[in-house]
C-alpha cells in the first residue's frame, strides 16, 4: 500500500483553531490534490463521520476519515497545526496533528479499515507520536507515516 502519502500531502503550520476549520482545509486540499472533485461533499462526509463519534484520539492526534464515491483514489494527508486545535478527544487535550484518510466508497470494508487500523496502532507508540510532533520536513513526515502502511 505504497504511494498513498507523498510530501505534497503534508501541510505544516496550518492556522486552523477548530475542528471545522481543519476539516474545511482537508476538504479543499482533497480537491486541489485531485483526490476528489467536490470539496463540499468531502466536508459533508468528514463532518458526518465526526458526528458519529469523534476522530480525535489522544496525545494531540486525530484521524479524520471519510468514505465517498467522490474520491478517485485512496489518499492520506498529514496536517500539523501551528497551535492547538479544539477537537473532542479521548483525553480532552487539543489536537496538534491530523492524519486524514480518504477512501473511495467501494473500499470501505477493506482498504479504509486497514489504513485506520494501521494508523491507530502506530499512534499507540510513543516514538511514532514523538517523531510526528518533532519533525518539520514534509519528505520525512511522509516517510514516517507511510512506514505504518504494510
What residue spans do the PLM features occupy?
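Cytosolic covalent-transfer regions centered on His/Cys nucleophiles
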Residues: 1-150
